[in-house]
């Protein structure tokens, strides 16, 4: 029997992002928390000052927690505007996670003290917005404004999970941040579901005995 050679997926290198011309105020928007079984989906919108650049911006998932925490005050200080938006577990259950993420992004943009004339959204789809918008695949790696938004959203949500951990230490939220890990599944099995769990997510439904 012939052994098939291992195939490795070639990494697709995306070209550097070219900013559309003719826009003065550009906001970057990103989300954190679509995958977890518990808590809000959190988004952030950031308008950076081109005359006051921030070194070391990158996708929040690729930065250490220490680096994210170091960059956060600098982003808040140097940005022309920043805001956080969110949707609760109840809204996620009512809308579905994709629509809830879009609503949370709308809320982040609406919360900016200065409204942008262009919003760059990480991913492949945009929420309905009152200004021009463009989806940017891997935007958190290619667009500084989106990287900054990614860092804010990640730090905010992680801190909320640490607070939830204080309320429910038996679940280990500070470690797994609500994601569907083995430890989280075991905690649900042992301790049940809390009000902050997303009841529409399959593992939570299963724990509640809700049939599909």
Curated annotation (Swiss-Prot):
Residues holding a divalent metal cation: 30-31, 122
GO cellular component: cytoplasm; ribonuclease H2 complex
CDD domains: RNase_HII_bacteria_HII_like
UniProt EC number: 3.1.26.4
First-tier enzyme category under EC: hydrolase
An annotated Gene Ontology molecular function: RNA binding
Chain ranges of the RNase H type-2 domain: 24-212
One family name in Pfam for this protein: RNase_HII
Catalytic activity line of the entry: Endonucleolytic cleavage to 5'-phosphomonoester
PROSITE patterns, alphabetized: RNASE_H_2
Entry's cofactor comment: Manganese or magnesium. Binds 1 divalent metal ion per monomer in the absence of substrate. May bind a second metal ion after substrate binding.
InterPro entries, A to Z: RNase_HII (IPR022898), RNase_HII/HIII (IPR001352), RNase_HII/HIII_dom (IPR024567), RNaseH-like_sf (IPR012337), RNaseH_sf (IPR036397)
Entry keyword annotation includes Zinc: no
Location in the cell: Cytoplasm
Needed cofactors: Mn(2+); Mg(2+)
Record keywords: Cytoplasm, Endonuclease, Hydrolase, Manganese, Metal-binding, Nuclease
GO terms under biological process: DNA replication, removal of RNA primer; mismatch repair
Family the UniProt entry places it in: Belongs to the RNase HII family.
PANTHER family xrefs: RIBONUCLEASE H2 SUBUNIT A, RIBONUCLEASE HII
NCBIfam families to which the protein is assigned, alphabetical: PRK00015.1-1, PRK00015.1-3, PRK00015.1-4
Family matches, as HAMAP family: RNase_HII_B (MF_00052_B)
Protein function: Endonuclease that specifically degrades the RNA of RNA-DNA hybrids.
Protein name: Ribonuclease HII
Gene: rnhB
């Amino acid at each position: 029997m012939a052994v098939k050679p291992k195939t490795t997926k070639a990494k697709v290198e995306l070209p550097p992002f070219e900013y559309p011309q003719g826009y003065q105020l550009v906001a970057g928007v990103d989300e954190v928390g679509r995958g977890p079984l518990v808590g809000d989906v959190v988004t952030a919108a950031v308008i950076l000052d081109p005359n006051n650049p921030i070194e070391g911006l990158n996708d929040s998932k690729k930065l250490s927690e220490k680096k994210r925490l170091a960059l956060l005050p600098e982003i808040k200080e140097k940005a022309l505007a920043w805001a956080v938006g969110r949707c609760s577990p109840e809204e996620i259950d009512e809308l579905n996670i994709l629509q809830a993420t879009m609503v949370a992004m709308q809320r982040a943009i609406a919360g900016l003290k200065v409204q942008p004339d262009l919003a760059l959204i990480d991913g492949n789809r945009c929420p309905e917005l009152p200004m021009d918008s463009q989806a940017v695949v891997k935007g958190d790696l290619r667009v500084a404004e989106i990287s900054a938004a990614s860092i804010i959203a990640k730090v905010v949500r992680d801190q909320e999970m640490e607070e939830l951990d204080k309320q429910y230490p038996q679940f280990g939220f500070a470690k797994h941040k609500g994601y569907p890990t083995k430890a989280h599944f075991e905690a649900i099995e042992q301790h049940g579901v809390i009000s902050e769990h997303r009841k529409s997510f399959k593992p939570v439904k299963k724990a509640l005995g809700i049939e599909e």
